[in-house]
Regions:
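Conserved phosphotransfer microenvironments
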Residues: 35, 70-91
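The C-terminal output helix
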Residues: 136-146
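Two-component signal transduction core modules
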Residues: 72, 121-122
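Acidic, metal-coordinating helix/loop segments flanking the phosphotransfer/catalytic sites
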Residues: 53-71
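C-terminal output helix
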Residues: 33, 126-135
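His-Asp phosphorelay/catalytic-motif detector in bacterial-type signaling
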Residues: 70, 94-99
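Conserved acidic segment of CheY-like receiver
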Residues: 17-39, 72
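Alpha4 helix (beta4-alpha4-beta5 surface) of REC/receiver domains from two-component response regulators
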Residues: 105-121
Length: 146
């Protein structure tokens, strides 16, 4: 199995299923930036990523609680309830919470991001290669754990 692939119990033997990623930001431009950075697939020949975009903390919590996701990408700069607080809540309350990639506003926020229990943190400005690499790595880690 190559990096970033997970097996679908309903697919034929050896076929990879598309990774499912939940993307939270109240800013449509921030969500678009992540989508463009990661691209449609994690690796050449892999299935297209199944993205679910949400813009409210309640939607993140409801979706993450379903257990359907391989990765959660949370915007730490979202208004009212940022991704740091949401990450902390999910890690405390959701059984077998998937990995969390937290996007912060600046490198100096890394110390605060550690409180969130996120599995990885990237600071703005986002480097598309770093975003793609982090997403692929976290999805692969989740696939091995699952």
């Amino acid at each position: 199995m190559s990096t970033g692939e997970t097996l679908d119990p309903h697919a034929g033997e050896g076929q990879a299923r598309a990774p499912r990623i939940l993307l939270y930001s109240d800013d449509v431009d921030a969500r678009q930036e992540v989508l463009l950075a990661v691209g449609r697939r994690l690796t050449r020949g892999a299935p297209d990523i199944e993205w679910v975009e949400v813009a409210s903390p309640a939607a993140v919590i409801a979706e993450a609680s379903t257990g359907r996701y391989d990765l959660l990408v949370l915007d730490g700069e979202a208004a009212k309830t940022g991704g740091m607080g949401v990450s902390r809540q999910l890690k405390d309350e959701v059984y077998d919470c998937p990995p969390v990639l937290l996007l912060t506003g600046r490198p100096q926020d890394a110390w605060l991001a550690s409180w969130s229990n996120a599995d990885a943190v990237l600071s703005r400005p986002l480097d598309p290669e770093d975003v793609q690499r982090a997403v692929a790595s976290l999805v692969a880690t989740q696939a091995l754990a699952g």
